[in-house]
Regions:
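Glycine-rich cofactor/substrate-binding loops
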Residues: 1-36, 97, 279-469
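Short, well-ordered beta-strand elements within core beta-sheets of diverse protein domains
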Residues: 40-50, 118, 165, 233-243, ...
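Residue-level "edge-of-site" marker
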Residues: 57-58, 225, 388
Length: 469
C-alpha cells in the first residue's frame, strides 16, 4: 500500500484491508477520478506549480489510464481507486515525477468531485428513463381516451373514469418526480476540487473555479470544509428517487390487481409473465412482482443512507465510503425498473369488455352525479340527497323504477326513469364533468395534447443538457 509509509507502517492482513477498502465499489467512479486528476495536474501546470515536463509526463500516463482503467482495474491491496491511480503513476514514472500528482489535493476532495461528476450523468440517465416512460403513458392514453374504467377509493369501486385519465394521473406524478430529480442537479453541479483535506491548499494562484469549469461544473462548493464533508446532495438524490419509486410501486400494484382472474382488466405481455412449475394454467405477473420487491428495497436503501449520515461529525469520515454504493445501487435499480415498466406498458392490452361490464353492472357508481343533480335542480340539501341515495344503495335489487319511487317518497322529487337513465349512464356521466382535469374525453384530449408539447420541450432541454455533460 502506497500510503502506509510514514506515520503508519507495516502490512495489513488481507481480511482487514478488504474490510476497509472501497476498491470494489470505486469502479463506478474510476474514469471520473482519472478525469479529476487530469484537470488538477493541468491547472498546476498552468500556474507553474509543477514543471511543464513533469506535468506532460503525468498527463500522458493519465490519458493512457483513462482509456483502459476498467480493463486494468486493480485487484490488489489498495485502499481505494485514488491510491491505485497515484501508485500506477509513480510505478510508471518514478517518485521524482509521479510523486507530484497529489500536490494540492486530497482523496477527500477528489472523491467528492468524482462522485458529483458521475451522479450528474446518472441523474440525466434517470431523467431520460422517466421521459421514455411518460411517452409510453401518453401513447396508451391516446388509445384509451374513451375506454371506461372503474375508479377506486379504499380498494372499492367508487366512480367512473377512463383508462386515459388513470394513465395521466400517473404521468403527472412522474412529472413531479422529474422536476424534483432535475432540481437536484443544481446542488450536485458544484465542484469540491481544491478543498484538499478540508481547508484548501497553499498553492499560489490555484483557481478552484477554473478547475471546476474544466470538469464541466458551473460553480464550486465554496466552503472547503463543506465541500468535503457534505453528502446532502446524495441524500437529496436518493430521496427524490425514492419518491419516484414509490409512485411507480402504486401504479404497478394496480396492474397486478387488474391482472387477477377475478378482475381481468389487463392482459400482460407474454415475456412479462411466467408459468408455474406444477400448475400449467398459471400466468404469473413476474416482472411486476420483481418491480414491487425492488421498490421496497429502494426504501430500505434510502433509510440506510439517512442513518449512515445521521449525527456523523464534521468533516470527513470513512463512513462516507459506505454511502456511495447505496447511491449507485438505487440508481441502477431505478433505471432497470423504468426500462422494464416502459416495455411492459408499450405491449400491455386491456380487456375493454370486462372494464365496460365492471362499470355498467353497478349503477351506484353514478350516484354522486345523481346527488348533485337533485341538489342543483330541486334545491335539496346535498347531505339529504346523499343520505337517501345511500339508503337506496343498500338494497339488493336496484332498478330505475325503484330509485324513482324512493326519491319521490323521501325527497318529494319527481325524476322519471328516462331522466334517471340519462343521469346514470356512464358515458353521459363523464361528458357532464367539465371541470379542468376531469375524465371527460374532451378534457382528457386537451390534457394529452398539452402534455405532449410539454414533454417534447422537456426532452429537447434534456438533450442540450446531455450534450454539455
Amino acid at each position: 500500500m502506497l500510503y502506509r509509509k510514514g506515520a503508519v507502517e507495516g502490512e495489513v492482513p488481507s481480511f482487514i484491508s478488504n474490510f476497509t477498502s472501497s476498491l470494489k465499489y470505486d469502479r463506478k467512479i474510476a474514469k471520473a477520478t482519472v478525469k479529476v486528476v487530469m484537470a488538477h495536474i493541468e491547472h498546476l501546470c498552468e500556474i507553474n506549480a509543477i514543471n511543464t515536463n513533469i506535468c506532460h509526463k503525468i498527463l500522458e500516463i493519465l490519458k493512457e489510464l483513462y482509456g483502459g482503467i476498467l480493463e486494468k482495474y486493480p485487484n490488489g491491496k489498495f485502499e481505494d481507486i485514488h491510491e491505485y491511480i497515484e501508485y500506477y503513476i509513480i510505478n510508471k514514472l518514478g517518485e521524482d515525477v509521479g510523486g507530484y500528482v497529489n500536490l494540492g489535493k486530497s482523496r477527500n476532495d477528489q472523491v467528492a468531485t468524482a462522485i458529483r461528476i458521475v451522479l450528474k450523468d446518472e441523474i440525466i440517465n434517470l431523467l431520460e428513463g422517466i421521459i421514455k416512460l411518460q411517452h409510453t403513458l401518453l401513447n396508451k392514453a391516446k388509445e384509451h381516451v374513451e375506454t371506461l374504467a372503474p375508479g377506486y377509493t379504499h380498494q372499492q369501486k367508487a366512480q367512473i373514469t377512463t383508462l386515459a385519465h388513470h394513465f395521466l394521473a400517473f404521468y403527472d406524478a412522474l412529472d413531479r418526480d422529474y422536476e424534483r430529480i432535475h432540481g437536484s442537479l443544481e446542488r450536485i453541479d458544484a465542484s469540491p476540487l481544491g478543498s484538499a483535506a478540508m481547508v484548501g491548499n497553499t498553492i499560489p494562484g490555484y483557481d478552484r473555479a477554473k478547475v471546476a469549469k474544466k470538469l464541466g461544473f458551473s460553480k464550486i462548493v465554496e466552503n472547503t470544509e463543506d465541500a468535503i464533508a457534505s453528502r446532502d446532495f446524495i441524500l437529496e438524490a436518493i430521496f427524490n428517487i425514492a419518491i419516484l419509486i414509490n409512485n411507480i410501486s402504486r401504479f404497478v400494484e394496480d396492474l397486478i390487481l387488474w391482472s387477477m382472474n377475478e378482475l381481468g382488466y389487463v392482459v400482460l405481455p407474454e415475456h412479462h409473465v411466467a408459468t408455474s412449475s406444477i400448475m400449467p394454467h398459471k400466468r404469473n405477473p413476474v416482472t411486476l412482482e420483481v418491480i414491487r420487491a425492488k421498490t421496497a428495497k429502494v426504501l430500505g436503501y434510502a433509510t440506510s443512507a439517512y442513518a449512515l449520515l445521521r449525527s456523523l461529525p464534521y468533516s470527513y469520515n470513512l463512513d462516507l465510503q459506505e454511502l456511495t454504493p447505496i447511491l449507485w445501487k438505487i440508481i441502477d435499480d431505478c433505471k432497470e425498473i423504468l426500462a422494464v415498466l416502459s416495455d411492459l406498458l408499450s405491449r400491455v392490452r386491456f380487456n375493454e369488455e370486462r372494464l365496460l361490464k365492471s362499470v355498467s353492472e353497478n349503477i351506484t357508481l353514478c350516484f354522486s352525479d345523481l346527488a348533485e343533480y337533485i341538489t342543483l335542480k330541486y334545491n335539496v340539501p346535498f347531505r339529504k340527497a346523499h343520505r337517501v341515495l345511500g339508503e337506496i344503495s343498500k338494497r339488493k335489487h336496484i332498478t330505475l323504477h325503484s330509485i324513482s319511487e324512493y326519491l319521490r317518497e323521501k325527497l318529494s322529487v319527481d325524476i322519471k326513469e328516462r331522466e334517471l337513465e340519462e343521469i346514470l349512464n356512464p358515458i353521459h356521466s363523464l361528458k357532464r364533468k367539465t371541470v379542468t382535469g376531469s375524465p371527460n374525453p374532451k378534457e382528457v384530449r386537451a390534457l394529452i395534447n398539452k402534455r405532449i408539447k410539454s414533454l417534447l420541450d422537456k426532452e429537447s432541454k434534456l438533450s442540450r443538457l446531455r450534450s454539455k455533460s
